Regions:
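Sec/Tat signal peptide C-region and signal peptidase I cleavage site
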Residues: 21-27
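Hydrophobic helical h-region of N-terminal Sec-dependent signal peptides
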Residues: 13-18
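OB-fold and OB-like single-stranded nucleic-acid-recognition modules
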Residues: 27-167
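Bacterial N-terminal signal peptides that target proteins for export
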Residues: 2-12
């Protein structure tokens, strides 16, 4: 009888472990907001800027010296954004790209501040069917500067997945 009880206990324990692992696997991925990537003091400064007068001579503030939020290093999650291709392969896949918070960023001058651009170099190039669409970019954030002719980023991401955004 003792053998049967031990086997039953092992079976129940194994089932509980399996259920626990399934719950972890199905857990909601942490959402990352673009404002989380801006240090509070810089965000406060940005919010205190006057409304732009489009009829006058606009002088855009220079945010090129923006800083990353150090506590975001190593955060795993997903962020919505637009993909700006940096390198496109012969197969028409993207092997390097920036993720930006709004459509047209990096194409227009000036680009967003570096702490509002995430550099991604996936292990395998990704296929893009809708370059104008928003996507969920999921992975692990790292503090890492990358610069090229399209812009400069303060963050990079170890990519887990890219999926179409559904709001």
């Amino acid at each position: 009888m003792k053998f049967a009880g031990t086997s039953l206990w092992r079976l129940v324990f194994g089932a509980l472990v399996w259920v626990g692992l399934q719950s972890v696997a199905m857990a909601e991925v942490r959402g990352i907001d673009w404002l989380e990537l801006i240090p509070p003091e810089e965000l406060k400064e940005m919010e205190s800027q006057p409304i732009v007068d489009h009829n006058g001579t606009p002088i855009a503030p220079d945010y090129s010296n923006s800083h990353p939020v150090l506590t975001m290093n190593g955060v795993e999650g997903r962020i919505p954004g637009y993909i700006v291709p940096i390198t496109v392969t012969e197969e028409n896949t993207i092997s390097e790209f920036f993720v930006v918070p709004y459509f047209g960023a990096c194409i227009h001058v000036p680009p967003p501040p570096p702490n509002q651009i995430i550099y991604v170099k996936p292990e395998k190039p990704i296929e893009m069917t809708e370059i104008w669409a928003a996507y969920w970019i999921e992975g692990k954030l790292k503090l890492e500067n990358q610069a090229n002719s399209l812009g400069q980023s303060s963050y990079s991401m170890e990519l887990t997945s890219v999926t179409p955004w559904e709001g």
